[in-house]
Amino acid sequence: MVINEAFQHSVFAACFCIMICAVSISLIPSKKDDLAERKSICFILGEDTIEQEYYSLATEFFQRDFAAKTDKLIKHVRSIEELLHFLNQHPEDEPWARIELVVHGNVWSGLSVNILDGGERAYPKELLKAVIKKQLPLLKSNVIDTNTIINVWGCGIGTNPIMNIALEKCFTDELGIKVRLNSSKKFVVFKRQVNNGQVKLVQASYWPYFFKRGYRPSESLIVKSLQEQFPDAPIDFKSAVLHKDKSLTIQESFHIPVSWTVIYDTKKDRPTVRKQDEKINWIKSQKQLMKNIEEFGIPFDRYQWTVNKIKHTDDHGNTVPAIKAIGMSTVYCVLKEDRSV
């Protein structure tokens, strides 16, 4: 009898629990529903120059594309520091679901955006140093979580391991929570479709050719060099360079800058850098600069160099004697569309 009563009570309790659980499940939104209700934001981190449409087309894409459009679109931010400050100062009720970053970039010289307001470009190593030295603000705990996705649309950025580490650290909050970071490994093109006029995000494989800025070689030499450098590439370089098939291939070119400044105690300590051979010898005597160039993977003779004595203003506002070198290499890329997003 005791056993039977216990059994009856247990059956009743079990049924009651099942009913409560069923009610609870119906009242508590699923994790998927929570994520669907969270907001998204896009940062356009630059402006177009003459004959460029990268940022304007990206703006249209993230405003109008059914799948990719974001709840907010911000166009005035121009540094990683300002970006992090903005996210901290404009929190939503829930962490962001998706953060889109649109920026010019490349595997060689990183992102075309300043690290600090008014500071230097976000080269991979320099960005990582800034994070390690705690020069950038930490994201607050309510800004992101482990479900937040950050897409970085900068050409080939995802193939640079140092840049990936730096970005991951930038978007780790004060509690150590990390986002789901996606950095594009392909070339990124925002392209208007001929048939319907809509803008699509296209990812493309790319094959680079480097030359001194202002010294573009003939198309036949570019074709020959690409064929020798990439013999197994699934593309007809001759047709691509001559632009015979515009529907399948795209051409892009941009500059890779290198800047180096050395400060001297007095003007007399500065060596003479008037002649071209003196300039080249001075550049080659700078071991760290030469190491940086080697890490870029761009041959030294593919840079156009200017070397001058200058007056440099240091961190304390003092004017000091210095020598500054600026190297510019142009990279010409042949692109082949892989897929549209």
Predicted regions: what is each one?
Residues 199-294, 301:
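A conserved mid-domain beta-alpha-beta active-site/ligand-binding segment of alpha/beta enzyme cores
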Residues 316-334:
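Extended low-complexity, polyampholyte segments enriched in Ser/Thr/Pro and acidic residues
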Residues 33-85:
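A domain-level signal for caspase-like cysteine endopeptidase catalytic cores
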Residues 84-92:
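Short amphipathic alpha-helix with an adjacent loop that forms part of the alpha/beta core around
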Residues 98-102, 106-193:
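Catalytic cores of nucleophile-dependent amide-cleaving enzymes
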